[in-house]
Design a protein with these regions (language model features):
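Surface-exposed, glycine/proline- and aromatic-rich loop segments on solvent-exposed faces
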Residues: 454-572
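Bacterial signal peptide processing site
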Residues: 25-27
Length: 586
């Protein structure tokens, strides 16, 4: 086995017959290996921890748009991070902080930033290229059309944005349909004018940054969108297409751009070029306008959750049951149900009730029979906010300090994957609803494996006309970057190897043939290595068994020139040989 080989072909012989795999597609328009950039992501399917799933699509309606709110402040200036994650189960530190009285020695960690939970990628800095790469890949998988950077506090986060631009451009040059970018600036006109000028000077000015021109979101116009106020500079004023931000607690102007909506069903905003726009958010802090008659921040609703009421009493706080219930339900958390008007932690974790009902507004308008009501653009809040600043009690004339926008996994609004109980369920729900909103259904014929017998000793031109599943080049890059929490060590991950960039599949009725191509030389197999060049297969008739939708794995066991096909246990371990492969390198 020589290191210079970049392609690996397999002949798989199984002890059973496969009808269809979860990621396969035939595209006759692709005639050569180098030319293949087939969007295999369209053909992937998934099932979340709660049994909800989505199917394959053949493409997207390009006259419909979905965007997501993206936050750049993690690690920018916070200092030590306090972790709120699972305070019910682990400790009561944060609750003690919020409930502490001045007479008890004050409220510690005032004005510090608190994480409501931990991302799958840790407490990362927003300029961590390894994390940005993962985010962009997830967005491409999801079919997102645009990303809105949050610069509403006046900062433009130049290093974070530049890193994001470079990686996004890299993937676009590989041939992937990448989401486009725009910025949201402050609702305050004067602050917005300064930000718009800085953003243009740092990222858009064609005299210096022309290479980024293809990355800006334009919709149906020839100008890049920006959410903000014209700064009064003729060049900049004429360069952008401007949308003013709609704040949820101000008078509604349906020509503005909504980042969140405190009405349900959500209001429809109108753009003269795009059409109808609706906000879809994971949760909504409507307690700030006393929607149910009681003022409450997210931390108030979280503190009054059923799991915490004993702790409130232990700190000497006594409230009537009616008041406790009212504060708990004053905000629309992840598990809020618009029918019963109540929150529920189990619904938040298992059903994403609020998020699903927000999407129901979009789908319902499409199904009402009046095409004038159809939604053309959905803006999702949000992806990766993660932190909120602890505010002092005296700032709100209240008995406790508080966190306004985020508190815990019930009262927060991030769809990014969590290390906690939420897992990747909100991301998968996002993908499912995007496909329902603008996906074009895939026919069963389009999902069939191409029928062709491959001679492993023959030339690679045998694979011409068989479309490949194109994967990202560069996604095995190493990670070594500081955490947003200065007290933590760097995040280090140097496990990446064998950067698979294309996988092709065919069969002749008896055997399945695979061609796997890597960006660089394939590393030699080392005895006992169970994770070398693994390929996982899911069979449409066996989705209830195996590991995360997959039932078989190739290459857990290699012996000489023969590798194995093995069943997967629920834990993801190889659990018995069912066939063999004959690998052949080129």
């Amino acid at each position: 086995m020589k290191k210079y080989f970049k392609s690996l072909a397999f002949l798989l012989v199984f002890s059973l017959l496969f009808s269809c795999f979860t990621a396969c597609k035939k595209d006759p328009g692709l005639i050569g290996i180098a030319e293949s950039v087939s969007n295999g992501f369209l053909n992937t399917t998934a099932t979340d921890d709660n049994g909800k799933n989505y199917g394959a699509v053949s493409g997207y309606d390009r006259e419909k748009y979905v965007g997501i709110f993206y936050f750049l402040w993690n690690g920018s200036a916070q200092g030590p991070i306090q972790d709120v994650t699972n305070q019910y189960e682990k400790n009561h530190t944060v609750m003690d902080e919020l409930l502490a009285r001045q007479g008890d020695g004050g409220t510690p960690e005032m004005n510090s930033f608190h994480h409501w939970g931990e991302s799958l990628y840790g407490h990362y800095c927003a300029d961590d290229a390894w994390v940005i790469r993962k985010h962009i890949e997830l967005f491409i998988h999801a079919g997102l059309d645009f990303i809105v950077f949050d610069t509403s506090n006046g900062s433009v986060y130049d290093s974070q944005v530049t890193t994001f631009l470079e990686i996004l451009l890299e993937y676009e040059r590989q041939g992937f349909q990448v989401p486009k970018l725009m910025f949201m600036t402050s609702v305050d006109p004067e602050t917005s004018k300064i930000s718009v000028r800085n953003i243009y000077d740092l990222f858009y000015d064609p005299a210096y940054y022309g290479e980024y021109d293809s990355l800006w979101f334009r919709g149906t116009r020839n100008k890049p969108w920006i959410i903000g106020t014209q700064p009064g500079d003729p060049t900049i004023d004429s360069y952008f297409y401007y949308k003013l931000p709609q704040w949820p607690n101000t008078a509604l102007d349906f020509g503005k751009f909504p980042w969140i909506d405190w009405n349900y069903p959500q209001d429809t905003y109108v753009d003269s070029h795009i059409g109808n726009i609706v906000s879809v958010s994971v949760s909504q802090h409507v307690g700030l306008i006393s929607k149910n008659g009681y003022y409450a921040d997210f931390s108030d609703s979280g503190l009054f959750a059923p799991e915490n009421r004993g702790e409130l009493a232990a700190h000497g706080y006594q409230f009537e049951e009616k008041y406790i219930e009212a504060i708990y339900n004053a905000n629309w958390g992840r598990g809020y149900d618009q029918v019963t008007k109540t929150n529920d932690r189990t619904r938040a974790l298992k059903e994403a009730t609020n998020f699903e009902q927000q999407w129901k507004t979009v789908h319902g308008l499409a199904a009402d029979g009046n095409s004038e009501n159809d939604i053309d653009m959905v803006f999702v809040t949000g992806w990766n906010e993660w932190v909120a600043q602890k505010q002092p009690a005296e700032a709100g004339n209240r008995p406790t300090s508080y966190l306004v926008d985020l508190y815990d996994d019930e009262f927060s609004r991030d769809a990014e994957m969590s290390k906690g109980e939420l897992g990747d369920n909100y991301y998968l729900q996002l993908v499912e609803n995007i496909r329902r909103f603008k996906g074009v259904s895939a026919s069963s014929a389009a999902l069939k494996i191409p029928e062709k017998k491959i001679d492993l000793a023959g030339g690679l031109d045998q694979w011409n006309g068989i479309a490949g599943y194109a994967d990202f080049a560069g996604d095995t890059a190493f990670r070594d970057h500081a955490s947003s929490n200065a007290s933590l060590a760097n995040y280090v991950d140097k496990t990446g190897r064998n950067d698979i960039v294309n996988t092709r599949i065919a069969w002749d009725g008896e055997s399945i043939f695979l061609l796997v191509t890597c960006a660089d030389a394939i590393t030699p197999y080392e005895a006992g290595d169970k994770t070398w060049m693994n390929l996982f297969f899911g069979v449409s008739t066996e989705q209830e068994s195996g590991w995360n939708g997959f039932q078989y794995v190739v290459n857990c066991t290699v012996s000489g020139s023969t590798s194995s096909v093995e069943r997967l246990s629920e834990a993801g371990e190889a659990a018995g040989k069912t066939g063999k492969t004959d690998p052949f390198f080129r």
